[in-house]
Amino acid sequence: MATMVAGISLRGPVMSSHRTFSVTKRASLPQSKLSSELSFVTSQLSGLKISSTHFISSSAPLSVPFKPSLQPVARRICPFTGKKSNRANKVSHSNHKTKKLQFVNLQYKRIWWEAGKRYVKLRLSTKAIKTIEKNGLDAVAKKAGIDLSKK
């Protein structure tokens, strides 16, 4: 059997019948078929812009400067007193120490704000609630630097 390698015909195995297989010249593809395939590819890409001078002349930076994201809303910190979680040791009977967190006793509390003539819902520690009852909401908020009109 004859095989085709790079356009050259090879003779098959020579046995009792000395047959030779010759391969005729390969017919080239017609130009119209090639151009139609090319136009199909270009029509698929017709909506895309490959290059543009609009971005080159622009003086605006390509990257956006990094802005840190907003802090999480439900942090375990009292905004009025600044109390945070305490890292303590959990001590077993065998005196084996492991770290644990002692959280602040935070409570959601709706407090009447006299200057604003409305209720303000705050997340406060129990110590801050006692301080507000003693000194007043305006005095404690002013000392902590908190604007109650945004709450």
Swiss-Prot record:
One GO term of the biological process aspect: translation
Entry-linked InterPro entries: Ribosomal_bL28, Ribosomal_bL28/bL31-like_sf, Ribosomal_bL28_bact-type, Ribosomal_bL28_sf
A Pfam family matched in the record: Ribosomal_L28
Main location: plastid
The keyword Transit peptide appears for this protein: yes
A GO cellular component entry from the record: ribonucleoprotein complex
Amino-acid biosynthesis among keywords: no
Superkingdom: Eukaryota
Subcellular location: Plastid, Chloroplast
Transit peptide: 1-74
One function term, GO molecular function aspect: structural constituent of ribosome
Alphabetic keyword roster: Chloroplast, Plastid, Ribonucleoprotein, Ribosomal protein, Transit peptide
Subunit field text: Part of the 50S ribosomal subunit.
Family: Belongs to the bacterial ribosomal protein bL28 family.
HAMAP family in the record: Ribosomal_bL28 (MF_00373)
Name of the protein in question: Large ribosomal subunit protein bL28c
